[in-house]
């Protein structure tokens, strides 16, 4: 995590190994981030399932279940299941 002071992570969030969280990220609710993901910068994820190998940049993901290896962004706003 390059700049931990610029990241907000709620207590119920789970993050896998070898995942990078970039500045300006907000992780809320029961969000699950898998292994080897790249999250941020400037991403908000709430109550979502982000499996292994996903990349998300400059986007908002709410109540969404992504597919393994998904690439999202920039400027996407996703809600509901894929």
Kindly give the residue locations of the regions a language model identified.
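Left-handed beta-helix
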Residues: 10-11, 16-17, 22-23, 28-29, ...
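Long, charged amphipathic helices and adjacent flexible linkers at domain junctions
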Residues: 1-12
């Amino acid at each position: 995590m390059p700049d931990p002071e610029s990241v907000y992570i709620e207590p119920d969030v789970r993050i896998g190994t070898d995942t990078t969280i970039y500045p300006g990220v907000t992780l809320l609710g029961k969000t699950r981030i898998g292994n080897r993901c790249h999250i941020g910068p400037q991403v908000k994820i709430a109550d979502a399932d982000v499996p292994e190998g996903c990349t998300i940049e400059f986007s908002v993901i709410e109540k969404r279940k992504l597919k393994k290896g998904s690439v999202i962004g920039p400027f996407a706003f996703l809600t509901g299941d894929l």
